[in-house]
Regions:
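Acidic catalytic cores of enzymes that act on phosphate-bearing nucleotides/polynucleotides
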Residues: 175-214
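A short, well-structured juxtamembrane/interface segment
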Residues: 1-11, 162-176
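Glycine-rich phosphate-binding loops that contact phosphosugars or nucleotide phosphates
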Residues: 10-154, 185
Length: 214
């Protein structure tokens, strides 16, 4: 709530997300929510604009959110540093309270997911989406969304009680798959891209995420 109060006092006109990989997909999800329910335009940063080209960015009236489960992504931190030089309000979303990004941001949104033991980040992706959805809901004074977010832990617990069995039933069909597509649209595009990435990382198959509208 302190962050949202600061945002409203500053008259933020754009949200600029800096992230890589899985965290980039969580940022896509947040972009849809903030654009839709808050009404503020969003953009995904191209970190190389800062790290490779030292590009000029005008982010004075922007909220710049760096997303990284470890909080140690050097290029994401570089974008946050550039943004702060421009006078932007900076926020870090990480799973490490002592990380460089957590220490640098004007605000830190802690995922509090515990140690991420999977190389292909899983629970930290889910927690990033949850934290960013909470930001969108509070910023947009969306009581209905906040109520739905309160239901998430119970829904996840219920899902985990039966989903492994369902996966066992369908997995045989795809055992020898060499490539595939993950189709979606809207907020679920973040899930499509993340599913694509996870299948590539863990099974070494060629995958592509597409919006069905394309």
């Amino acid at each position: 709530k302190n962050l949202v109060s600061d945002i409203k006092q500053r008259d933020i006109r754009m949200v600029y997300f800096a992230a890589r990989g899985t965290s980039d997909h969580a940022s896509i999800y947040a972009s849809y929510l903030i654009s839709t329910y808050v009404g503020v335009p969003t953009a995904l940063a191209l970190p190389s604009v800062v790290t490779a080209y030292d590009g000029k960015l005008c982010l004075k009236d922007a909220l710049v959110i760096g997303v990284s489960q470890s909080g140690k992504a050097a290029d994401v931190l570089a974008v946050m540093e550039k943004a702060k030089q421009c006078g932007a309000l900076t926020v870090a979303v990480t799973n490490d309270l002592q990380s460089p990004m957590a220490q640098f941001g004007d605000y830190h949104l802690y995922c509090n997911a515990g140690l991420e033991e999977s190389v292909a980040a899983t629970k930290t992706f889910t927690s990033q989406m949850y934290v960013l959805a909470m930001l969108a809901a509070v910023w947009g004074d969306n009581e209905a969304m906040l109520a739905k977010l309160d239901e998430v832990p119970g829904a996840v617990e219920q899902l985990l009680s039966y989903i492994p069995h369902d996966i066992e039933k369908i997995i045989q069909r795809y055992r020898y798959m060499e490539n595939g597509f993950v189709l979606s649209r809207g907020t679920s595009m973040a899930i499509a891209f993340e599913t694509m990435l996870k299948l590539q990382e863990t099974n070494y198959v060629k995958m592509k995420g597409y919006a069905v509208s394309d």
